[in-house]
């Protein structure tokens, strides 16, 4: 019937949450992106980092958005500044929107976002000089515990999403795998070890439907091929690499394109749709790569 009766009133049916996800920005964020989000009106925006090379423009722009937002900074956001000042400046601008090593509950729409280690460059576990300057020495197990503690603090009634700059180790060791090293031979698994360990611990206590990350660009550097950007493991967790770089483009008809990844999930955490999308500046959906449900051959 589409709705359930409670007494004499009809309880409204809760619609799916619609999340827009901006992959590695690398300075490609401007007024057209803000206008696009106004046109699309998603329930929330997730940003996986590498906003620029340590500049304040994009963090300041993100902080102005009225849209519910969660962000984790990437390795480029340190700006090659070992003192950590560039990182601190952006953290201050983003404020509570930055959820690295922490929890950000978006109410509305009703989503718990746990941030992984910020400013990671992948490759197992390593803290940059900038990270040490800002956070002090943090060992691998300490990082795991920070991520898990944030997840334990999340409202259990909300669906949980892990937001990371680099994805976890364990998704494959070939260059074209979601976190495979593609810029140097031999290829190897370049995912984050602390994130992989945290995922295993979190899933002992609650469901984890989705892990969102970037860092490993979709276009492979050596072969020019395309990376696998979506994996669903045997326990049902989905891993989405959103790093379409460059995310501003032009199609063969001369139309300007803006890339966003798109996820739709229920309030109980069931993921209904995962896609990479390219929009026109007017908000029209011009191209879509559907990742889930997997299209039939």
What kind of region is each of these model predictions?
Residues 1-70, 78-86, 296:
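N-terminal active-site segment of His-dependent metallophosphoesterases
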Residues 2, 7-15, 104-107, 201, ...:
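Binuclear metal-dependent phosphoesterase catalytic core
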Residues 11-14, 157-207:
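Active-site-proximal segments of metal-dependent phosphoesterases and phosphodiesterases across multiple
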Residues 16-26, 110-124, 161-165, 237-244, ...:
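Active-site-proximal beta-strand elements of phosphoester/diester hydrolases
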Residues 21-24, 45-50, 69-75, 98-101, ...:
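Active-site neighborhood of phospho(di)ester-bond hydrolases with catalytic His/Asp-centered motifs
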Residues 26-32, 52-57, 76-83, 105, ...:
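Active-site environment of divalent metal-dependent phosphoester hydrolases
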Residues 81-104:
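Glycine/small-residue-rich loop that forms an oxyanion/phosphate-binding "nest" at active or ligand-binding sites
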Residues 108-159, 185-191:
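Binuclear metal-dependent hydrolase catalytic cores centered on His/Asp/Glu-rich metal-binding motifs
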């Amino acid at each position: 019937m589409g709705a359930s009766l409670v007494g004499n009133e009809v309880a409204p049916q809760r619609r799916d949450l619609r999340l827009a996800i901006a992959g590695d920005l690398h300075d490609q964020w401007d007024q057209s992106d803000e206008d696009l989000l106004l046109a699309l009106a998603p329930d929330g925006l997730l940003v996986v980092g590498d906003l620029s090379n340590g500049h304040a423009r994009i963090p300041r722009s993100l902080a102005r958005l009225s849209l519910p937002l969660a962000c984790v900074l990437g390795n480029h956001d340190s700006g090659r500044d070992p003192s950590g000042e560039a990182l601190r400046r952006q953290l201050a601008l983003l404020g509570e929107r930055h959820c690295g090593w922490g929890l950000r509950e978006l109410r509305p729409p009703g989503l718990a976002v746990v941030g992984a280690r910020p400013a990671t460059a992948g490759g197992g576990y390593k803290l940059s000089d900038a990270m040490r300057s800002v956070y002090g020495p943090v060992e691998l197990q300490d990082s795991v515990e920070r991520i898990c503690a944030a997840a334990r603090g999340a409202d259990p009634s909300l669906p949980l999403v892990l937001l990371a700059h680099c994805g976890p180790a364990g998704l494959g060791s070939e260059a074209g795998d979601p976190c495979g090293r593609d810029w140097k031979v031999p290829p190897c698994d370049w995912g984050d070890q602390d994130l992989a360990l945290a995922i295993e611990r979190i899933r002992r206590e609650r469901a984890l439907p989705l892990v969102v990350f970037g860092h490993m660009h979709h276009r492979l550097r050596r072969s020019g091929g395309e990376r696998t950007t979506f994996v669903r493991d045997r326990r049902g967790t989905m891993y989405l690499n959103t790093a379409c770089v460059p995310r501003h483009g032009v199609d063969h008809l001369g139309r300007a394109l803006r890339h966003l990844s798109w996820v739709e999930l229920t309030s109980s955490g069931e993921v209904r749709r995962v896609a990479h999308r390219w929009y026109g500046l007017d908000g029209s959906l011009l191209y879509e790569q559907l990742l889930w449900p997997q299209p039939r051959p």
